[in-house]
Amino acid sequence: MKKTGLLLALCLLTTGAFAQADQSSPAGTVATNVNFPAEAIATPTQSDLYCAGFVNKSLLPNATYVAGGLDTPNTTQFSDGGELIYLAGKSYTLGQRYRVVRELKDPNRRELFNGQDAMLKVMGQPYADLAIVRVVDTRSRMAVAHIELSCAPILPGDIVADFAEKSPIAFHPSMKFDRFAPSNGKAGGRIVLAKDFDSELGTGMKVYMNLGSNQGIKVGDYFRAFRSYEADLHNPVDSLSFKASTAEDTQAKPPSIEKNMLTKSSGPTIHVADLPRRAVGEIVVLDVTPTTSTGMIVFAMEDMHLGDGVELDPQ
């Protein structure tokens, strides 16, 4: 009798759990750890906010720049907190903070996905955030400043720009991640570039996307990053897998993928456009311009790639 009562209780609990999962899932889905894994979202730090870099539609003025430091010319890189540097140009204000940035070029320039160069031309010029400095002396022809926050070594010639405080990104509690969510019709774009010109991306890394405040994007918004199999089909390297044989000797009617001529198929043709798009992670917006946004990857199911799609996530 006790065993019967225990089994009945377990059945009721199991039924209730499945019912609760079904109620919290979109129509046509069953929430499981496979297609709805829990995501723990990383919260951006002060360094993440001020060291992310950005892409700007127009070139920043370069009339104010770093000229050197206490040990110039013996020392050409300045990065220690409290280190003094000299700022060339005019209109520095004593006690004012400034932002040191660098206009970038990729020494190994090549397209990592079709159309990347054209998108970058529309987005503008990439810049690296190097440091926040505060002016402590303006009596000479050059201002003297000390480094308050260092992101990367400063070099002579790096640009000195105006500084603006950034609001912290609020903590986001853990939630369920829908791996196979179809398009929600919200604003979307692509990951076009990444900090340090990286191409294989994971949690904590910074990315630059081709949509901004003109599309209603604001700091603190979240994007769902996704990848379709059509992207692999059109990639000269990844597409090689689609051209390999998919047949197995015991299959009476083996299928082919996109009419692969290497597979003698009497079976069905699998069209990659019909495969579900897969979500690969979440990105939070750290900064925006009218046409671009800087984001930080806060959750990744797998490596993100340049060219991956992004879509505003209303969650």
Pin down the residues of each PLM region.
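Bacterial N-terminal signal peptides
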Residues: 7-15
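Surface-exposed, polar/charged interaction patches used for macromolecular assembly or partner binding
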Residues: 2-5, 18-315
